[in-house]
Every structure is written in C-alpha cells, then in structure tokens.
Amino acid sequence: MNKNLMIVIAALLVIFGLVMSGYNNLVGMNENINGKWSQIENQLQRRNDLIPNLVNTVKGYAAHESDVFKAVADARAKLGGAKTVQEASQADGELSGALSRLLMVAENYPQLKANANFTQLQDELAGTENRIAVSRQDYNNAVQEFNSSIKQFPTVLYAGILGFSQRDYFEVPESAKAVPQVQF
C-alpha cells in the first residue's frame, strides 16, 4: 500500500478519534447542564409548594392585603408556565419580589410573626431560597464550562455541525437587581 495513503488514513483516524472524544465530552457536559436545571426546577417546585401555606397563614391576619396575594398567585402561575430558561428566570424574579412584599406585610402584624406555623414556613422558605441560589450557581457554572468548551479549538470546528449550541444562563432579571428603598 502507498505510504502517503497510509499517512492520510492514519491522520483521518486520529481526527475521527478526536472528534468522537470531543463529541462524547460535549454530550456529558450537556447532560450535566440538564441535571443541574432539574435541580433548579425541584427547588422552585418546593418553594411553590410552600407558598400557599404561607399565603393562607398571612391571610388569616391580613385579609385586606389582596393585591399582595394576587401578585404572589400571578407570579406562581407564570413560573409554572415557563418554558425556557429566560421565562423561568423572569418569573422567578417576579415571584421573589412578590414574596418579599408578602413578608413585608407580615412585618406589620406582630401576632403573625409570633405564630409558630408562620415562623416555620418562613424558615423553610429561607432554606429553599438558599438551595435555589446554590442550584442556580451550579447550573450557571455548568453552562459556563459547556459554552467555553464549544468556543475552543478544535471543538468550535464541529460543535455546531453536531448540533451543539450555546446554552442560556439563569440570569437575574433587571427588576430584581434594583436595591429596595427602606424608609424609617
């Protein structure tokens, strides 16, 4: 067999091996991102499950605060219907804002703050918010690793051809970045 042909075949086999290895690496990173996203969804669902109990507890003391309760319900519905990372991120920001307003309403009712059920729900909500923050961080780290990988040589040459594209970060909406005004 021709020596040049052997060199070409060997080079093609090496290139094929590198592409397959890179492909498998991208598949693994993509699945890692999907797993991290599932963890965010699990924590968001946990928070969603806590909210009705919290709202009902506050309603018992502050029934006339219907606009706050409606904002929480609307934000929960929007989060439940989110289909993309951007929609979920936006809805999560709205729900966090509505929950903050709900907890501010609770501050006006000393009997409510002394209610053991309310205190327990508030603690569970705080713990869940912390788990959501950690899950977001893990997700965004996985997305950053994946996005960096598909932009690096030689992966950039074949990632798009094999169906891999940049993934979206779970970003905080602009409304959540605003510093709340506190008046004494």
Description of each model-found segment:
Residues 1-184:
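A helix-centric hydrophobic-segment signal that preferentially recognizes long
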